[in-house]
C-alpha cells in the first residue's frame, strides 16, 4: 500500500441519539485547536449520507430504524472502501455511527474476495443484534450480525415485517453474497455492555472476548501477540475502534458511554501495537458525538488516539508492507 486515504462517513442513521454525524467535524476542530496539519496531509473522500430522513415524523421499520436509507448509504461506503484498496491505498474510515462497519467489512471482502478476513472489535458493545433480537431497533447495534450472516432466531423477540427482512438480507449480502466473516475470526476487546441475546450467541459461537481485567493484567504488547496468534489463519485484518471503548470518564461525548473502559494511554498503546501488524488493511473510528460533550473533550481525546494510530500505519507504509490480492 502506498498511502492513507481518509473516508469520511457522516451518516448517523443507525444511532439512537442524534449528533454522531458531526463527529468528524468535531475531530477537525480538535485538530485545528491542536495546531496539527493532519487533515491537510491526507486525501479524503466524503461518502454521501442521507441524514435528512431523520426529519421524517414516523420512522419506518421499528426493528431496524431507517434500514432502507442505511442500505443505500452502506452501498456507498462499501464501494469507497473497495476502490481505495484496489488503488493500493489504506482506507482510514471516520464514521458517525457504528452501523458503517458492516459496509467497511463488505468493501474489504469485495477488494480481496479470496482472502480470509479477521476483525478486531474495540468497543463497549458487541453489536451482534439483528432485527429479530434488538431491544432498540437501532442498526448501529447490528453490524456484526450482518457481516456474519446471523439472525439469532433462537433468541428471537421481534417479528419484523417483510420489507424489513428484505433490507436486512441486502445488508447481509452487501457487495457480494454470503457472510464476510467467520466467528472464529472475530475478537472482542473491552466489550462490557451486552444483552442476553448477544451473550447467548457469543457463547454459542465461541467468539474470543478480551475483557478489561485481562487488558490491565497483560498489557497491550502481550495482548497484541495473543490476538494475532488467534487470527493466525487470517490473511487480512480490520480494526474497528468505537470511542465508547474508553472509560466513561473520557467518553461523555458519545451516544452510549459505559464505565470500566480503557484509559486514554491504554487505547493509544493498544491501537498502535495492533496497527503495526502488516496484515491490517483498514482502521475505523466511530461514534464521536459533540452534542453530548463538554468543550469537545471527546473529539480531543479521540484525535490524540487517531494521531497515534496513524503514525503506526505510516511507519508500516514506509517499510512497503503490502497485501497482494
Predicted regions and their residues:
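Conserved alpha-helical scaffold segments that buttress catalytic/binding sites
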Residues: 2-325
